């Protein structure tokens, strides 16, 4: 099976004045920070069945993250804060001394996952249970220094966002799905954990992440009349995505402010099928994020999040003879 996912994420964000921005005069930053943050993410991959119980998926992320600064600027349009400016992650970033603070690019992490079929009812109603284990391989497009580091009591120009956090990660997942003859005809979910195996070469220790994906889909009988050419609407469903992140940290800088968080995104999902067996999915979601303000360095923050994801799947009628 070959697949391609495209996701567009829109963040309308705000956070309070950064305390002690400058120990002497706060760099003149007696203002709140706000702006827009937009992610465009493509995930390309392939899944191959090794035997009747195991398959392997290899995928590669490509993405761009762009910030639109909505705070004060000077007469030339330059941001009045060293923390934010209008820029994209595809471009390198250097500070005033010419030190490279971020490596720009669009290539994200690569991923290899093995999944084992623990239980499968077959084509009819019943349960399906899968266990997965995998590895994330980091990209070199990272930031090179903590955004919260001070030099002579002041923050220097830096970038907060990045393509990769520079660490290898162990991925574990457990998936359960149930097919029924009444609504919802298909429901289930996946619990996934992502555990960093090392710090980045620049001393960043990423968060552990624990994610839950839940879905419930309708049947197709009443929807097949909705067609566009050879494509037909096969299912409408509800989704819920939950993501809990623990504290991240930098060497000699301590915990990263506002890094411990809980994100939940309810959404609606549309599945579109074709006679060839190919499938197209569209998910529209609204996100809500809660920050655990437990440390003195944490600040008040609020974000409105919207997401649209389009995924495409095609099953190849091919057999790799050496695997069977």
Description of each model-found segment:
Residues 17, 22-24, 194-324:
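Outer membrane beta-barrel transmembrane domains
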Residues 6-12, 60-66, 109, 118, ...:
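Transmembrane beta-strands of outer-membrane beta-barrel pores
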Residues 1-3, 55-57, 113, 128-132, ...:
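Residue-level detector of the transmembrane beta-barrel scaffold of outer-membrane proteins
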Residues 8-41, 160:
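Surface-exposed strand-loop-strand hairpins of Gram-negative outer-membrane beta-barrel proteins
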Residues 2, 40-44, 108-112, 129, ...:
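Hydrophobic, lipid-facing positions within transmembrane beta-strands of outer-membrane proteins
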Residues 64-207:
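Outer-membrane pore/translocation modules
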Residues 33-66, 180-216, 228, 244-247:
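Glycine- and aromatic-enriched membrane insertion/assembly motifs of diderm outer-membrane
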Residues 10, 46-54, 118-123, 178-185, ...:
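Outer-membrane beta-barrel strand-turn architecture
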């Amino acid at each position: 099976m070959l697949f391609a996912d495209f996701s567009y994420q829109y963040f309308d964000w705000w956070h309070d004045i950064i305390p002690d921005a400058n120990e002497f005069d706060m760099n003149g930053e007696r203002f709140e920070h706000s702006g827009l943050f937009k992610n465009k993410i493509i995930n390309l991959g392939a899944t191959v069945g090794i035997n009747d119980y195991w398959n392997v998926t290899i995928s590669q992320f490509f993405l761009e993250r762009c910030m639109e600064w909505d705070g004060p600027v000077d007469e030339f349009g330059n941001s009045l804060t060293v923390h934010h400016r209008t820029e994209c992650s595809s471009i390198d970033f250097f500070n005033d001394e010419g030190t490279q603070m971020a490596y720009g690019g669009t290539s994200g992490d690569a991923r290899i996952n093995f999944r084992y079929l623990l239980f499968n009812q077959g084509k009819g109603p019943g349960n399906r249970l899968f266990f997965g284990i995998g590895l994330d391989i980091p990209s070199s497009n990272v930031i090179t220094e903590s955004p919260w580091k001070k030099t002579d009591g002041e923050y220097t120009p830096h970038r907060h966002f990045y393509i990769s956090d520079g660490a290898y990660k162990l991925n574990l997942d457990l998936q359960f799905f149930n097919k029924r003859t009444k609504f919802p005809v298909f429901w289930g979910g996946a619990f996934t954990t992502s555990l960093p195996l090392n710090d980045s070469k620049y001393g960043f220790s990423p968060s552990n992440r624990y994610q839950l994906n839940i879905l419930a889909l309708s049947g197709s009988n009443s929807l097949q009349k909705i067609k566009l050419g050879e494509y037909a609407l096969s299912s409408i469903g509800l989704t819920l995505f939950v993501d809990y992140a623990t504290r991240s940290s930098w060497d000699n800088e301590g915990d990263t402010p506002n890094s411990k968080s809980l994100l939940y995104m309810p959404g609606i999902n549309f599945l579109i099928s074709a006679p060839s067996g190919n499938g197209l999915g569209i998910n529209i979601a609204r996100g809500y994020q809660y920050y655990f303000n437990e440390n003195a360095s944490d600040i008040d923050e609020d974000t409105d999040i919207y997401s649209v994801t389009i995924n495409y799947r095609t099953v190849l009628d091919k057999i790799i003879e050496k695997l069977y």
